[in-house]
């Protein structure tokens, strides 16, 4: 990180009041820290727009393991892109539903494609993907 620089920001009073309430709810010690986090998130999002970015993420899938051929299809697709999958965790939520959590890393475009492919398999009830750039200059 570089040297901290002060700068001024002009805001509408109503917007500032809403921002202060947001900072309080989220437990920020100062407006500056909240603003730093928001800037980092915007930069991370911008980097992830690039198909060449390096990224890491978590993919969560909920599915009924009794759905015909679904477990096999999920495993086959994971093996097709084994080099992007670092780890998996399989949890039995109830008699029917399973939660599969995958830790993924690699090219941002490639892991987004993997997440989309797994989430779109027929029988997957819910899929959620969250990923972050691993470029050093974001942080």
Curated annotation (Swiss-Prot):
Amino-acid positions noted as binding Ni(2+) in the UniProt annotation, renumbered to this chain: 79, 90, 92, 98
Entry note: cofactor: Binds 1 nickel ion per subunit.
Cofactor(s) required, per the database record: Ni(2+)
Signal sequence segment: none
Single GO term (MF): nickel cation binding
Gene Ontology terms: biological process: response to nickel cation
Coiled coil: none
Gene3D superfamilies named in the record: ACT-like. Chain A, domain 2, Met repressor-like
Matches recorded under InterPro entries: Acetolactate_synth/TF_NikR_C (IPR027271), ACT-like_dom_sf (IPR045865), Arc_rbn_hlx_hlx (IPR013321), CopG (IPR002145), CopG/NikR_regulator (IPR050192), Ni_resp_reg_NikR (IPR022988), Ribbon_hlx_hlx (IPR010985), TF_NikR_Ni-bd_C (IPR014864)
Organism domain of life: Bacteria
Family membership: Belongs to the transcriptional regulatory CopG/NikR family.
Purpose of the protein: Transcriptional regulator.
Classification via HAMAP family: NikR
Protein name: Putative nickel-responsive regulator
Annotated organism of origin: Lawsonia intracellularis (strain PHE/MN1-00)
